[in-house]
């Protein structure tokens, strides 16, 4: 076999050694290439020899394994700088011909070296070529560098460590720096080196006093980015033509005692600019003072928007120093004194040229569009510090308009225009946007905008229509704030499909049109069919936006839509409330204006909390009482049936959640009333409780003196405000009522007093649990017509012979409850949705039922925050009573009762109309070593509990693992394998088949029915184990180690492969010798153009032969003898 050598492969060492045996050749070549690729280093080195420190000596270079010297022809400080940096001794002390020490021997590798100073290695500099020179070793160069450990710097006579005369310690002696050519770049290096921040100023002429000793530096050349002053270019240590009268000094930011303030302005962000320097305040001259300078000053003062740069015309005159003159900022500086300026205190000004600024912190800046039909179209109007102005169209273009639209969150500009005003109307304050590039996020970020009493030629006001411009209206309604929804986009009005408009979107629409809250949304062209455009977009409002144009939109997903599906909305303003029929403005019948019509409010849900908010809104103090029997008259028209859910802390009725109970009639004469404390809010007294007669607490009210406290009622433990154990407030504490003689007439009075309709059931024997504290009333005997329980006959306050096991309760007609009915006893968070109202259970219709509404139901039931609607079981065929349909909850309500719906009316409905819900499961694994192992715990009835291991097997475990997304079940653990839990044992005798989607689908005993202890808690181990708790990922190895490991693996694999090939070839030769030489071609090996990089190797098997392949030209391959013969010829 022959190994052919071909050189010329870029980036590789030449492989020229010939090998005989095939296997040894391949292994050697691969190993050499892998090692070369892994090391990838240079064969040149640099050192200093015969010096007194590691950073000084004769310069020697190692080339081709041989050390040699460098000739001093052309040798300068730039070359010395390269050597010092390369050796990690970046400070140049001096360059020298190394004649004061022994000369070098052997090669002189470099001559005529010419460096720029920024090279990373000496051999990167230009030179004659390796070994080319006309020198002797008497011309060998040397250097003296420093790593900085033997150099020090300090500032003297400045009063602190960050200001003063510059002094440097070199070779054990302190010396100064000459001020020749010293500037702010030099000062910046000094301040940075000393950790004193940026340079504020520099000085010469021994401003901080004359030093003594050597003058170490003169004519320094710094760029400002050097890490130390001695790294700047210089003539050499101690070389100068100065005396100490020229000693340089600096003042750094950390030692400058600098401050900035505004004086004599009308706001905290305006006024004359003053700077404190060296303990004294002074002004800034307005020479060259412009908007860039003002922008830096405003930013520094925490008022980031510069409105005007005030000069001599407007700024008041200061006194004392004029510290700065000819300030010239770029706009990006963090402080005014970082801008270019004359030396501190040098100026050519008087105080009538003092500079000032008018800035803003953003709180007094506003941008808006007016008169365009929506917030995203119209005339551009700005308000700056309470002064309103327009934008002049003289410099108005699409770029400026784009910035306006962007700032308002209205997309991009579709078109610009202008509004022409007469000269009489043109006394506006104008804003000129002179130089927006379109990329700004705010018009205040545009450069060189001008504001104030400027003249706008032709009196044109800029206008814009933005891409998000959507102007809504309601059309076809009988009253204002109701009708078909139409939206104007661009110049075109169009309708919205009823599948593309949610309750949240309707809420935003009502708010934008100043129509209060949404009452209902009606599909099917309820307000008549529109014509023309139907917008093919779905509004995706969250509900808290102020305008429809702020809501995201998405393309419609359900195909085409016709005008027969135009959406309509009915809004209502609950915020207009009044009291009518009383002797004072602070008492009377409660009337609410809804849909433009005033009407009395039904008192079936009116309570003291609602009354408190109403009195507060009307500035009538607090609610003293809510009398029944319509003492202020019934009013005209049918009372509104809306229910307010005030907590008593709101400032306005419009802040309270509202339930619209639809069109069912209010009981005759049940009109809400209130007596507020009015001007006597500070003189309210508790009702007289000294008498044993409950009637005494009412006498004050009937005599016209409002009282609070005794006789207040509440219902406890009933699941709602209109059912529960009765508790009455007296003498500062709550107590119960005994059930002796307790009947439906007594219960009627309680329900009426609480605004809960009529009594359905009068309960006794502590039906709603035993109370605590006093038992205030016994033998209550009402005739059913009293307005308050305290007006009924009884034994008197506190006179009783009862115990709390006799506490009375009530269920009123307005009590509402919620449940899910399922055939499975283990399912409490899934089933048919039912509500309890007016004493009877009924189902809820599924029309318009959304995921948000389902979430409210699940949360109200204490299940989870999410759920889904499921089909009704096919075996359910009987009709049942339904209470309500079209329930559509927005985001926010805590109960179903706060969601708009169709009117509440009991009717028969088929199972296909009913709502069936499954609330999202809550299951977890505890105490496991991973997220997919541990004790099984389930959430039920508001608490976590465990599962008993009776009948627990791998099928049950499989369902749990699947439910948690943890793959296959590996083990069904028993006997508290992961420790004993606490709390309830919710499930027992679980018997899954293994294919169920959740544990709740498996047969089991009823919830909480168990004969187990926690020592029998069930557990699981699943296959898809999540990252172990507390695990830490190991840090990655270095690339060199990784490459080395890769090389070893490849090499081992290659050796094994090639040994196999060799054995196979030997067997083939034996076969050839037995059948004749011409049966098989001889195999030869030849090298191609280059060795391979280790990361270019790719081994694959093709037609039974192993071939090495890379991303470059193949390094070698297997060829037949015939191919080798053609190659050799």
Swiss-Prot record:
Modification after translation: A soluble form (sCD163) is produced by proteolytic shedding which can be induced by lipopolysaccharide, phorbol ester and Fc region of immunoglobulin gamma. This cleavage is dependent on protein kinase C and tyrosine kinases and can be blocked by protease inhibitors. The shedding is inhibited by the tissue inhibitor of metalloproteinase TIMP3, and thus probably induced by membrane-bound metalloproteinases ADAMs. Phosphorylated.
Keywords: Acute phase, Cell membrane, Disulfide bond, Glycoprotein, Inflammatory response, Membrane, Phosphoprotein, Repeat, Secreted, Signal, Transmembrane, Transmembrane helix
UniProt topological domain (Cytoplasmic) ranges: 1061-1129
Cellular localisation: Cell membrane
Domain SRCR: 46-146, 153-253, 260-360, 367-467, 472-572, 577-677, 713-813, 818-920, 923-1023
Intrachain S-S bonds: 71-135, 84-145, 115-125, 178-242, 191-252, 222-232, 285-349, 298-359, 329-339, 392-456, 405-466, 436-446, 497-561, 510-571, 541-551, 602-666, 615-676, 646-656, 738-802, 751-812, 782-792, 858-919, 889-899, 948-1012, 961-1022, 992-1002
Domain of life: Eukaryota
Predominant localisation class: membrane
One GO biological process term: acute-phase response
Positions of the record's site feature: Cleavage: 263-264, 275-276, 327-328, 354-355
Motif Internalization signal in this chain: 1085-1088
Signal peptide start and end residues: 1-40
PROSITE patterns: SRCR_1 (PS00420), SRCR_2 (PS50287)
Membrane-spanning residues: 1040-1060
Entry membrane topology: Single-pass type I membrane protein
Extracellular compartment segments: 41-1039
Cellular component annotations (GO), alphabetically ordered: external side of plasma membrane; extracellular region
Record function comment: Involved in clearance and endocytosis of hemoglobin/haptoglobin complexes by macrophages and may thereby protect tissues from free hemoglobin-mediated oxidative damage. May play a role in the uptake and recycling of iron, via endocytosis of hemoglobin/haptoglobin and subsequent breakdown of heme. Binds hemoglobin/haptoglobin complexes in a calcium-dependent and pH-dependent manner. Induces a cascade of intracellular signals that involves tyrosine kinase-dependent calcium mobilization, inositol triphosphate production and secretion of IL6 and CSF1.
Quaternary structure note: Interacts with CSNK2B.
Swiss-Prot/TrEMBL domain comment: The SRCR domain 3 mediates calcium-sensitive interaction with hemoglobin/haptoglobin complexes.
Name assigned to this protein: Scavenger receptor cysteine-rich type 1 protein M130
């Amino acid at each position: 076999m022959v190994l052919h050598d071909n050189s010329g492969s870029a980036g590789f060492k030449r492989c020229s050694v010939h090998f005989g045996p095939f296997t040894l050749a391949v292994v050697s070549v691969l190993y050499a290439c892998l090692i070369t690729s892994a090391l990838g280093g240079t064969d040149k080195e640099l050192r200093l020899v015969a010096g007194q420190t590691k950073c000084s000596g004769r310069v020697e270079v190692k080339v081709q394994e041989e050390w040699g010297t460098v000739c001093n022809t052309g040798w300068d400080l730039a070359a010395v700088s390269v050597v010092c940096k390369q050796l990690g001794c970046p400070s140049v002390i001096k360059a020298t011909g190394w004649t004061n020490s022994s000369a070098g021997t052997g090669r002189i590798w470099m001559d005529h070296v010419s460096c720029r100073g920024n090279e990373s290695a000496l051999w990167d500099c230009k030179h004659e070529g390796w070994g080319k020179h006309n020198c002797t070793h008497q011309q060998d160069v040397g250097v003296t560098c420093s790593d900085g450990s033997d150099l020090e710097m300090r500032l003297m006579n400045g009063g602190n460590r960050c200001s003063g005369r510059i002094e440097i310690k070199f070779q054990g002696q302190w010396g100064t720096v000459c001020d020749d050519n010293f500037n702010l770049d030099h000062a910046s290096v000094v301040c940075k080196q000393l950790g004193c921040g940026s340079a504020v100023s520099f000085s010469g002429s021994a401003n901080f006093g004359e030093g003594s000793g050597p003058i170490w530096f003169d004519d320094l050349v710094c760029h400002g980015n050097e890490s130390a002053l001695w790294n700047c270019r210089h003539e050499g240590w101690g070389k100068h033509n100065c005396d100490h009268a020229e000693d340089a000094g600096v003042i750094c930011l950390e030692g400058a005692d600098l401050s900035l303030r505004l004086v004599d302005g009308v706001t905290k962000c305006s006024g004359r600019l003053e700077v404190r320097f060296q303990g004294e305040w002074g002004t800034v001259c307005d020479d060259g003072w412009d908007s860039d300078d003002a922008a830096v000053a405003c930013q520094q003062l925490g008022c980031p928007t510069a409105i005007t740069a005030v000069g001599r015309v407007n700024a008041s005159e200061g006194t004392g120093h004029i510290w700065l003159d000819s300030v010239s900022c770029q706009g990006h500086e963090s402080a005014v004194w970082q801008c270019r300026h004359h030396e501190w205190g040098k100026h050519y000004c008087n105080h009538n040229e003092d500079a000032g600024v008018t800035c803003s912190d953003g709180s007094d800046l506003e941008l808006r569009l007016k008169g365009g039909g929506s917030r995203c179209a119209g005339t551009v109007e700005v308000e700056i510090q309470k002064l309103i102005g327009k934008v002049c169209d003289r410099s108005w273009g699409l770029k400026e308009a784009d910035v306006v639209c962007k700032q308002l969150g209205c997309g991009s500009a579709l078109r610009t225009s202008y509004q022409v005003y007469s000269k009489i109307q043109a006394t506006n304050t104008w804003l000129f946007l002179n130089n927006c590039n379109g990329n700004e996020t705010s018009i205040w970020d545009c450069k060189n905008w001008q504001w104030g009493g400027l003249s706008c030629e032709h009196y044109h006001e800029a206008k814009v229509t933005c891409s998000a411009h959507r102007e809504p209206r309601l059309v076809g309604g009988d009253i204002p704030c109701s009708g078909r929804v139409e939206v104007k986009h661009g110049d075109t009005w169009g309708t919205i499909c009823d599948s593309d408009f949610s309750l949240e979107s309707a809420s935003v629409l009502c708010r934008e049109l100043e129509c209060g809250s949404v009452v209902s949304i009606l599909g099917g062209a309820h307000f008549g069919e529109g014509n023309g455009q139907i917008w093919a977009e779905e509004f995706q409002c969250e509900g808290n936006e102020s305008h429809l144009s702020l809501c995201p939109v998405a393309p419609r997903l359900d195909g085409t839509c016709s005008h027969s599906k135009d959406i309509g909305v009915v809004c209502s303003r609950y915020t207009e409330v009044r009291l009518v029929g009383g002797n004072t403005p602070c008492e009377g019948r409660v009337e609410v204006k809804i849909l433009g019509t005033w009407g009395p409010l039904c008192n079936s849900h009116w309570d003291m909390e609602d009354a408190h908010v109403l009195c507060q809104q009307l500035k009538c103090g607090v609610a003293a009482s809510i009398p029944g029997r319509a003492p202020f008259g019934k009013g005209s028209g049918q009372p509104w049936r809306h229910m307010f859910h005030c907590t008593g802390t709101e400032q306005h009725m419009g802040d309270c959640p509202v339930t619209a109970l639809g069109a069912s009639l209010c009981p005759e004469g049940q009109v809400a009333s209130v007596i507020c404390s009015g001007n006597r809010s500070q003189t309210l007294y508790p009702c007289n409780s000294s008498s044993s007669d409950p009637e005494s607490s009412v006498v004050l009210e009937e005599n016209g003196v409002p009282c609070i406290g005794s006789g207040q009622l509440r219902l406890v433990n009933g699941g709602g405000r209109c059912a529960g154990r009765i508790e009455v407030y007296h003498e500062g504490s709550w107590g119960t009522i005994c059930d002796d003689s307790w009947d439906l007439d007594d219960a009627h009075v309680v329900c009426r007093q609480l605004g809960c309709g009529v009594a359905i059931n009068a309960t006794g024997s502590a039906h709603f649990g035993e109370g605590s504290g006093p038992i205030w009333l016994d033998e209550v005997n009402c005739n059913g017509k009293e307005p308050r329980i305290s007006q009924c006959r009884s034994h008197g306050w506190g006179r009783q012979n009862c115990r709390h096991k006799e506490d009375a309760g009530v269920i009123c007609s307005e009590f509402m409850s919620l449940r899910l009915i399922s055939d499975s006893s283990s399912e409490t968070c899934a089933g048919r949705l039912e509500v309890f109202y007016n004493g009877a259970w009924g189902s809820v219709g599924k029309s318009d039922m959304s995921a948000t509404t389902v979430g409210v139901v699940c949360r109200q039931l204490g299940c989870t925050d999410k759920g889904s609607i499921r089909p009704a079981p096919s075996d359910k065929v009987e009709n049942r009573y339904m209470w309500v349909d079209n329930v559509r909850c927005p985001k926010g309500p805590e109960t179903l009762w706060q969601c708009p719906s169709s009117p509440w009316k009991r009717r028969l409905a088929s199972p296909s109309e009913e709502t069936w819900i499954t609330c999202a499961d809550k299951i977890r694994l505890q105490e496991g070593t991973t997220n997919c192992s541990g004790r099984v715990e389930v959430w039920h009835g508001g608490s976590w509990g465990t599962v008993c291991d009776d009948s627990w097997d791998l099928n049950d475990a499989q369902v749990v693992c699947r439910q948690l997304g943890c793959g296959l079940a590996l083990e069904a653990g028993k006997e508290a394998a992961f420790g004993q839990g606490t709390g309830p044992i919710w499930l027992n005798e679980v018997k899954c088949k293994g294919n169920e989607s959740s544990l709740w689908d498996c047969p089991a005993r009823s919830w909480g029915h168990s004969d187990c202890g926690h020592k029998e808690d069930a557990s699981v181990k699943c296959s898809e184990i999540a990252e172990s708790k507390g695990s830490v990922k190991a840090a990655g190895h270095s690339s060199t180690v990784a490459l080395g490991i890769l090389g070893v693996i490849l090499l081992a694999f290659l050796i094994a492969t090639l040994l196999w090939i060799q054995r196979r070839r030997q067997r083939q030769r034996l076969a050839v010798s037995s059948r004749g030489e011409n049966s098989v071609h001889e195999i030869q090996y030849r090298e191609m153009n280059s060795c391979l990089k280790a990361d270019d190797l790719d081994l694959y098997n093709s037609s039974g032969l192993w071939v090495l392949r890379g991303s470059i030209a193949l390094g070698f391959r297997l060829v037949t003898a015939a191919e080798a013969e053609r190659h050799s010829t």
